Amino acid sequence: MATLVELPDSVLLEIFSYLPVRDRIRISRVCHRWKRLVDDRWLWRHVDLTLYTMRPKVMWHLLRRYMASRLHSLRMGGYLFSGSQAPQLSPALLRALGQKCPNLKRLCLHVADLSMVPITSLPSTLRTLELHSCEISMAWLHKQQDPTVLPLLECIVLDRVPAFRDEHLQGLTRFRALRSLVLGGTYRVTETGLDAGLQELSYLQRLEVLGCTLSADSTLLAISRHLRDVRKIRLTVRGLSAPGLAVLEGMPALESLCLQGPLVTPEMPSPTEILSSCLTMPKLRVLELQGLGWEGQEAEKILCKGLPHCMVIVRACPKESMDWWM
């Protein structure tokens, strides 16, 4: 069996990539070879800092010493639930990310208070922005904001962002490159607001609406009216009926449809009704049913047999993470 000393650099780099950031830095003290490997650009393309309570001083050090132009994606947490005296993400730090990390494409922020951080301070190179349990101000996504902000943004994930409301949704229209939108637990968005917002976001190709107060029927109606080119839909089945699902019939570009439980409504379409609607979707290739309790049941057999051209996935909902920031 080969020892660590005998392993080639490429294998050691692969091993080091699975280590948390703190451990990567510690092992750089083992020997000159490991120090050189830890400094390799490849190892710092994707960085996850959500495991730590990261003080701004430490973050600045990481930014200057290790990340810089190497960084492609970054996950980091804030101090939203740590009290008013806790340090917060600053506009200066986010601006520095944009200046020192010109290759940064994806930024995921968790439990961060962004109410005093202008959206203009985010790196302009971002293609994906994820906000998980974050606070934002009313001005953050206001329609009258500078239209040149985040010109390359293609995907935005808003997961349990309590301040997000109809006005914010309509403000997303200034991101002309936006193609993917995920709304998770954004309970302030209304049916009227969703319809008005999607009317101006007709170029979206992927939409997920999960755990919101909106009924599935009203969501699908808005999609059928305004998102004729949508390719992927994922939504919670709360308030879904057979007539509501039928509004998707004939959707010309839809390739993937996911209906996510738990099953809580007697109006839920039967497997036969779901099959009937799916057969009218010419490009449908993936049908996923999550958390409906149909695994191994007759419903699964009906759908698999009736949709031979589709990948039919029937499974339980994945277990929710025990990590409070996820």
Swiss-Prot record:
Its BP terms in the Gene Ontology are: protein ubiquitination; ubiquitin-dependent protein catabolic process
Report whether DNA-binding shows up as a keyword of the record.
Answer: no
Q: What PROSITE patterns does UniProt report for this protein, alphabetically?
A: FBOX (PS50181)
| Cysteines engaged in disulfide bonds, as pairs | none
A Pfam family = F-box-like
* Pathway(s) it belongs to: Protein modification; protein ubiquitination
Positions of LRR repeats? 51-78, 86-111, 113-133, 161-185, 186-211, 212-236, 237-261, 266-291
Keyword Repeat listed? The answer is yes
On the tree of life, the source organism's domain of life is Eukaryota
> Which SMART domains does the entry link to?
FBOX
Q: Name one GO cellular component term.
A: ubiquitin ligase complex
Give every F-box domain span. Answer: 1-47
Name the record gives this protein:
F-box/LRR-repeat protein 12
Q: Which organism is it from?
A: Homo sapiens
